[in-house]
Amino acid sequence: MDDIPTLLARTLNPTTSKSAEEALKVWELQDSSFALKLLNIVAEDTVDINIKLAASLYFKNYIKKHWDSEEGASIRISDEVAELIKREIINLMLKSTTIIQVQLGEVIGYIANFDFPDRWDTLLPDLISKLSAVDMNTNIAVLSTAHAIFKRWRPLFRSDALFLEIKYVLDRFCEPFLALFVQTNNLLRNGPQDAESLNSLFQVILLECKLFYDLNCQDIPEFFEDHMSEFMTAFLNYFTYTNPSLEGDEGETNVLIKVKASICEIVELYTLRYEEVFTMLYDFVNVTWTLLTTLTPDEKYDGLVGKAMAFLTSVIRIRKHAEFFQQDQVLQQFIELVVLPNICLRESDEELFEDDPLEYVRRDLEGSNSDSRARSAIVLVRGLLDHFDQKITSVVSTHINANLQQFSTNPSLEWNKKYVALQLFSAIAIKGQSTRLGVTSINLMVDVVAFFENNIKPDLLQPAGVIHPMVLAEDIKYVFTFRNQLNSQQLIDIFPTILRFLEMPSFVVYTYAAIALDQLLTVRHNHVHIFTSLLIAPHILPALNQLFLIVESASTPQKLAENDYLMKAVMRIIIMSQEAILPAASLLLQHLTKITEEVSKNPSNPKFNHYLFESIGALIRSLSKSGPQTVSQLENALLPVFQNVLIEDVTEFIPYVLQLLSQLVEASGNEPLPDFVVNLIQPCLSPALWDSKGNIPALVRLLRAMIFRGPQIFISNKFVEPVLGIFQKLISSKVNDHFGFDLLDRVFTVFNANILAPYINHIFFLLLSRLKNSRTERFVLRCTIFFFFVASEQTGTCGPDNLIQGVDAVQSGVFGQLMTSIILPQAQKLALPLDRKISALGLLRLLTCDLVLAPDAIYENLIIPLLTCILKLFEMPIEQAQTDADEELFMDEIDADSMSFQASFSRLATTGGKRVDPFPQITDLKQYCATEMNLANRNMGGRLSQIISTHLPGDGQSVLQSYGYVI
């Protein structure tokens, strides 16, 4: 096997990278000190810098995959290796080049997430000891690493553990941090003024600003309150500081601009959280106002302007400070000097629209540039509306009307005035908004519907080429933004017009048309979709053809997948068409398989990929309802593509393919499993496949489906034992134990007792061991459901007798102790209606089985506890209300922006997978229980009624009689 540096060098060559990566994976599996070898390569002076960089990147990814691996994982970093890494990595980082410092600093921050401070108590002292009064490059590395560790506090919820960690840091870090802060401040006043030294100094100041925010983000520490004047005075000086030596390249956001933007974040935090002690608030308001009214429109200032406006917005939203701005003249100046200049189109905006339209869309819709001038200006207007709604609405409306008037005089030349008017109208009209729901509340002083009829609809109905594409894009955006305010007929009438814009040559226009298509199809009035499958049927084929034409016109897999909005529109059409999609089935299969084959070559856009597989899932969902013939058509088209993904080991796609395979297997009814699926069973049992966390949910579902459809295949090929081996691995994991129960449910319902007999004792031994030694609340609840499920079912190895005998095989008589001490007390905690139904039926089966109810039965002492538990399930409130999600609503809300695409599993909403009620025929549980108890009572010669009369309190007896039980 080649050595590691040779393999790393080969990863840099596209023709050899895949084989080199496979060989490195072998090293990972075989060499427990693999991580140390990578670090040694990074440390070796004679190694080529590109190989050292490759080693640092591979090391970073290796640590992220395996640092927190569970016991039993195929790759796990030993405690000894972990300690060596922590001992060496800081010194190695400090002596490395900048680009490698970044990678190692990220690793330190990642390890700190798990080990700091409890298992890495030397980290902070080591970092502090490296701080220098003169070496700014070392300080940059140290402070960058500290920021990587502390910044994770920012989004966290308050907790005792979090505050203990922060206190640990504050007690050790504050004094040296202040000393360095004072030193850099003095150096700035008295030190050298050459560009290189100044730049390094301000890089340190920038990191000091970021760390100041980190250390103050949860609460204001006493130390910083005591030294607030020192810090804030320095920040104020930095905010007004200028020096031509720091200008850098034209158009570049230099470090001084970044420092000022970071200070804006700090003063916004203090305004929002610690305003009562922030005595210099108005000093910062004044310098910020001056800044905003003097900065040029250059792009390099965009981030600073955005954060400066965010700070002013935070001040304005506090009523007592808003009064500072309440004079009409001040409000007028806000709109004219701050808002309007930052909403108006710049030449750079037009260039972005033409030259990088995808980035334009992302900035406009996703907030990828959340500090953009226009976005921040709009938020500022809405902040002013909170307190001065009438005045601001009046002032802005005047500017809207003036811009519309200018546009009307010469639409082809003054089109940018219409653009500004639309931006301003949205700014004052919207009071509440979410990406998923659109506008949820509006300013009642403006008429959204009238504005649509007078200013939007006429543009949309103009012939192609009349309205400028940037205005047309805003017109379309208006429709999907205010989709909940426009009435059903307006949306239905404009829908065909929106679809026509898919044929426009402008990337932004056809993308916004695709977004409108997607979002309009989910609109509900009175909880009912306004666009039914019948209503959209005439538009299905033309829209799909045009969308596929655009997607497939790309020259590379990366370009093909870049516009996820188009694929989301395809997905939405398939979902909403339901069975009406059947005439387009062949077309869809042809295009979806072709696209999957292409993007498999180089998966580059996780969101596009997710919508692609959701589209396939939606197609399977709709077509499988048409019978076995269409399922066969689906299998013939899709299985070869899925096979290719698995053979080529396209890691990103495997969880998706496994879900879709599960859906296909489940849809095939009682048809024999296709050979391809049969041949998949053994690979699915390979332990290596289960090491990837993202595969586990889909693998469990696929195994469940294959066991249900082909139990004899598992029996004849001796696959039952490997399946139980997987169950054992899952059940030992606190993260994945619930998947182990999902698999065990299916094993018990499908395989007969004679098949499972050799394993029953060990299965229950594993469960009881977890309950005794390492139980969690989730495990206990899931184990409770499993016990009741086994008791309630009558197939396979289920049934109350099998449950009791299986548990007692571990230790005689332990079933009764388990029920009274753990299982029965947990039943009332079950929240989902289906779990409670299964539990009630399981309790009923146990109550009426011979091992409990028969004279001199071993567990007759459980009769009253079991019966009491049934009554509590029926009559007492649920401790924590919870319901199964509405699957249709879930599909309406499919949004890849909210999903994670790394090791985690991304569920496909369209593949179903919803739990099925195993007892759909039982609708009135109380009556059913009474009937079964009456039958058992007769069979036992009235024994049950005798025990109830003697031992169950009178109110319990009355409740039972109300169900129909005869005592």
Swiss-Prot record:
It is found in: Cytoplasm; Nucleus envelope. Signal peptide: none annotated. One of its GO terms (cellular component) is nuclear envelope. Keywords: Cytoplasm, Nucleus, Protein transport, Transport. SUPFAM superfamilies: ARM repeat. One of its GO terms (biological process) is protein import into nucleus. Pfam families: CAS_CSE1 (PF03378), Cse1 (PF08506), IBN_N (PF03810). Gene3D superfamilies: Leucine-rich Repeat Variant. One of its GO terms (molecular function) is GTP binding. Its main location: cytoplasm. Export receptor for importin alpha. Mediates importin-alpha re-export from the nucleus to the cytoplasm after import substrates have been released into the nucleoplasm. Binds with high affinity to importin-alpha only in the presence of RanGTP. Belongs to the XPO2/CSE1 family. This is Importin-alpha re-exporter. The lineage of its organism: Eukaryota, Fungi, Dikarya, Ascomycota, Taphrinomycotina.
